[in-house]
Amino acid sequence: EFRRVLFRSECAVLARQLAERIANELQVPCYCYEAAAKTPERKNLAICRKGEYEALPQRMSEATEAPDYGAREWDEQLAQTGCTAVGARDFLIATNFNLNTTSTRRANAIAFDVREKGRPMREGGSPVGKPMKDEKGEIIMQPGTLKATKAIGWFIDEYGIAQVSMNITDINITPLHVAFDEVCRCAQNRGIRVTGTEIVGLIPKRTLLEAGTYFLKKQQRSTGIP
């Protein structure tokens, strides 16, 4: 059986073709994101999802906000189906970091420390100060320490603890083991410890091998350990 590797650019073409078919055959408008994005801004899925379902009636009527395929005026069918997004990207790793606290606020603080988007800059450097804005009226963000990551803090009833929940959108920029160490460091700076982790879904084998090699070296042990 003949097999070959598909390049991301080829996947992007296929993603756009699929998005067009979904729009034409199912009448569900589609945004294209990541490698399939038609504009630089839409590489970020969060931009495509901006405002979520409630914002769709307005977005459908604006040329700069409308879906890439199947854009039309808001109607009863759209009210039922909404829109969808199709993209081409590398593996996304979804991981959760368990914390020895029940405080969602502290978990969020750690998430804001590390996620690429960071947190709003506030007047006087106070956590309760008013968000600072630029000349365009947009909130000024203080970037976090980990590129290509998104994160939030929440409380898990099942475990009775708070977590930092993270998506790593580019493992070539921020490998899993780097994210783990950085979350541990930022948690420790706030008097909190990471007590465990969860991986949600599939991850590449090389991610685990890289993590194993990294921590063996950190322990000053041979990387040849089976």
Name each model-derived stretch.
Residues 7-226:
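Long, contiguous binding/interaction regions
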